[in-house]
């Protein structure tokens, strides 16, 4: 979440690192889509198709890709939220690598200290909030 907007959601996975990567991927995809629409009034995938057909300048797509990477999809300063605790730091590390500034989760893992340590070691350090309540109920 950033500026009151959900920028990526990873859902329905059993792999905690994989689901964090899915959320990051979605954030990058949505950011590129936003740039494509702002610059060319078309969806990113539509521009890719047009470029493959020789009807759009592929260098303009490369510029969108470069700008998306440079901005890290707008993720720096965002908040990573989980409906269940992080049993290890690896899922948290995925978000921190992209510039997440705060991690919110219920806590309760025997290894919560690893996630706390990850936030403390981030550059800049990230905040961690424990809600004390799981939203994942099945």
Regions found by a protein language model. Name each.
Residues 1-6:
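Terminal or standalone catalytic/regulatory effector modules within metabolic enzymes
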Residues 14-138:
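Feature captures the catalytic cores and cofactor-binding loops of soluble hydro-lyases/lyases
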């Amino acid at each position: 979440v950033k500026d009151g907007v959900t920028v990526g959601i990873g859902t329905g996975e059993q792999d905690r690192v994989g689901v964090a990567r899915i959320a990051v991927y979605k954030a990058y995809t949505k950011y590129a889509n936003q740039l494509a629409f702002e610059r060319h009034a078309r969806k990113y995938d539509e521009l890719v198709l047009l470029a493959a057909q020789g009807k759009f300048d592929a260098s303009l797509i490369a510029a969108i890709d470069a700008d998306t990477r440079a901005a890290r999809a707008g993720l720096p300063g965002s908040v990573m939220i989980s409906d269940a605790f992080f049993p290890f730091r690896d899922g948290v590390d995925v978000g921190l690598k992209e510039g997440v500034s705060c991690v919110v989760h219920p806590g309760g893992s025997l290894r919560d200290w690893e996630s706390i340590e990850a936030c403390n070691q981030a550059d800049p350090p990230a905040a961690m909030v424990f809600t004390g309540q799981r939203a994942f109920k099945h």
